[in-house]
Structure formats: C-alpha cells, structure tokens
C-alpha cells in the first residue's frame, strides 16, 4: 500500500511540474518581436501556469504594443533588454489608431500575475527613447507605458525603465498588488523637460509600493479616485511633482479615495513633496490620508493642499462660481524635515506659461505648507513635527485662511511666519 501511495504522489508531483510551461520570446534581428509573442499568446498555451521569458543577452524590438490576455498563475519575466521604436512618427501613427489599447504593454486582467524584471544592472531595461520626444516637445499621441489592469494578487518587481516617453505604471482596477524594487529613470540629458513622466498611478485596492526609485518630471506617485488601502513607503523620488492624491473631481465627477499611507520617502529637487489636488466643482470625499517621515531637499512646495487645481494644458485658469468641492477629512502630515527651494528667479522645468501653472497668489516661495481650502469642506487637517529651512536663509512661512477650517492645523493659520501650535508639537 505504501508503495502505491508513493507512486501516486510522485505521479501527481510530476504532473504538476509538467503542467508549468515556459515560453521564451523569439527574437529576429531588425524585426518586430511582438508578432511572435502575440501568436504564442493566441494559442492559449501560456495564459495559465506559465512563464513568458524575455531572455537575458537578447535585445528585443517591441515595435508594436503588447496586449496580454487574461492570465492565471503567469510570470512575465524580462531578463533581456526591450526597445520601443526610436522614430516618433511611427509610434504616433500606432497610438492614433482606434485599436490602440492605451499603453504599450497592457495586462487585461487575471489572478496571480507577476511582472518581473532583472536585478542585473546591465539587463532587464526597457528603453522608450523618450529623449527625442522631450527635445521635440512632442506631446501628441504619446503612449502610456504599462497598464497592469484588473489583476488580483499581482506583483511588479525589479523593473527598470529608461527614458520613458510619458506615464509609466498604472494599476487601474487591480487588487492586492505588491510593487517593489522598481527603477524609473526619466532624466533629460539636455535642457528639455520630461513632461508627464508620472511614476506610479495607484488605482485599485490593497496596493503596496515599496523600495522604488523614481527620477522623473511629474508625480512620483499619484493616487486616483476609487483607490483604497494604498501604502507607498521606503522609496526615493527626484525631480518630479511629488507624492500626490488626485487630481480629483475633474468635470464635477464624484471622487472617492480612502486609507492611504505614504511614509519614509526622500524627495529631492522636486516641485512638491506631499500634495493633494482637487478641482473646483468636484464632488466626493478623500479620507484618512497620511504622509509621514518625509525628507525633502530643494523642494519648492513641501506641503501643498489645494481644492482649486488647474491644468495648464486646458488654457487659462477659469473663473468658477461652483459651490461644490471634493471634501477632505483626516489628513496628517507628520515628520517633515528638509530644505525649501526659495532661490530668486528659479523656474521649474514644467512651466510654460506666465505666470507659471503652479504659481500661488501671494506666495513668497518660502512656505513649508500651503492650505488652499474652501470653507466647510475640510475636517481634521493636521501638520505636525516639521523642521524646515530655506536655501536663502530666510524665515519659513505658511499660507492658510483661518475662515476655511476651524480645527487646529498644527501651526498658526495665516499668511505669515511658520509658528507651530501645541497640536503641531505633540
């Protein structure tokens, strides 16, 4: 009897092992490698219990977008280097077609899906040739990078993106995803600015981002409407527009963001460190948002909350008489330490208008916190344990209208010097 059981166990083990398949993506010199992968995916043989491997030592040409089917127990492993087309017009033509899925790499759904890069410093890079786009200030028909959408129980790890054209990772509709040890390098080698190179767009629920490195020209993190239970920690962000909630409420839409923790992050040479942005006329609620243990260096606006957001791409800021605004509740900014960039005449690279899109009426450039709120829309907003200096040696200031919020915000609520209150020191 024992022998029969042992034989059966070995047979079951062998069956399990043999059920897992690996497909190594084929490469043809000078040709688009996407069709070979698409053909393999179309067989259905690699949609479950499979590894899809871009092999180390191979430089793949991803000249057309990749769209994965719904996957179950699949790892996409990028050990080789991947390259977009280096011709702007070629990509624009593809993006302009009705069949373009929205991103160059699209995951359409599934369970237990891993997107894994390489820890080898020379391999596992995805090169989008974004420098040419930035130099040409070309913003028409730009592709997003990676749509990791509708995935339950997912992992994005060890990915390395080099000079992305624009937006990088998005997790719309996904649940229980761990995103860690990824590197995004959207740094211009000329005076051109890498517009809209957002790092991570957190959409979905139960998402953990940690140990990520982002150098870019827009939000390091942006948390969109519908996001719940989001953690972003132990990471480095340089050159961009901060750790952002929103923008929310565009076009009067109803926003819903809850339970976000952002902690242990270094912000360097950024426009913002911690930011909340919602549009005038929006609806809904953002609740229980914490930014904690933030070290900032050469940052223009370390803490910035506005319910009057505006996008310079839409033209001049409109005059709105709307009484609706996205409400905010239980916002905590705790343990912020660093330096404010108040250098006279400094203009951040994304500024293409006069005044700049980020200009705040009455601001001196020395503010550690700006609370741009509407009356009766904000509850329990607290800034505590802040230690900031300006690069010019000037005294640190704040902007806050006491008629818009009745609770103690952790400092004297006025347009003046930063004076912590008891709540800001406890």
Q: Which residue stretches match the model-derived regions?
A:
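Extracellular/periplasmic carbohydrate-active domains that bind, remodel
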Residues: 2-426
């Amino acid at each position: 009897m024992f022998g029969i059981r042992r034989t059966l166990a070995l047979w079951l083990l062998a069956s399990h092992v043999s059920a897992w398949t690996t497909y190594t993506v084929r490469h043809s010199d000078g040709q688009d490698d996407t069709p070979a992968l698409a053909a393999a995916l179309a067989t259905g043989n690699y949609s479950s219990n499979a590894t899809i491997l871009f092999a180390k030592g191979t430089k793949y040409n991803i000249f057309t977008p990749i769209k994965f089917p719904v996957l179950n127990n699949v790892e996409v492993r990028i050990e080789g280097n991947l390259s977009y087309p280096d011709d702007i017009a070629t990509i624009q033509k593809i993006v302009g077609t009705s069949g373009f899925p929205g991103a160059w790499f699209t995951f359409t759904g599934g369970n237990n899906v891993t997107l894994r890069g390489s820890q080898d410093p020379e391999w596992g890079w995805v090169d989008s040739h974004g420098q040419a786009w930035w130099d040409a200030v070309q913003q028409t028909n730009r592709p997003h990078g990676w749509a990791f959408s509708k995935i339950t129980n997912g992992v994005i790890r060890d990915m390395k993106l080099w000079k992305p054209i624009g937006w990088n990772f998005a997790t719309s509709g996904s649940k229980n995803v761990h995103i860690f040890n990824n590197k995004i390098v959207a740094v211009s080698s000329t005076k051109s600015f890498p517009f809209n190179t957002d790092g991570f767009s957190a959409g979905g629920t139960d998402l953990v981002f940690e140990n990520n490195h982002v150098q870019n020209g827009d939000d390091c993190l942006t948390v969109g409407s519908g996001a719940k239970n989001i953690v972003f920690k132990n990471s480095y962000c340089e050159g961009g527009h901060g750790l952002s909630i929103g923008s929310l409420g565009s076009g009067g839409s109803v926003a819903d963001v809850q339970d976000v923790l952002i902690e242990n992050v270094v912000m360097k040479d950024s426009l913002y460190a911690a930011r909340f942005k919602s549009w005038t006329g929006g609806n809904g609620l953002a609740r229980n948002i914490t930014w904690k243990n933030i070290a900032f260096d050469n940052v223009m606006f370390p803490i910035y909350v506005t319910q009057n957001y505006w996008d310079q791409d839409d033209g001049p800021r409109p005059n709105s008489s709307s009484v609706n605004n996205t409400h905010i509740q239980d916002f905590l900014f705790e343990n912020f330490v660093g330096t404010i960039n108040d250098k006279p005449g400094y203009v951040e690279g994304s500024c293409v208008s006069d005044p700049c899109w980020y200009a705040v009426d009455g601001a001196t450039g020395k503010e550690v916190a700006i609370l741009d709120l509407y009356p009766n829309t904000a509850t329990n907003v607290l800034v505590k344990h802040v230690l900031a200096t300006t690069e010019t040696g000037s005294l640190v200031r704040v902007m806050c209208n006491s008629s818009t919020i009745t609770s103690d915000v952790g400092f004297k609520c006025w347009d003046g010097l930063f004076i912590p209150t008891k709540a800001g020191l406890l």
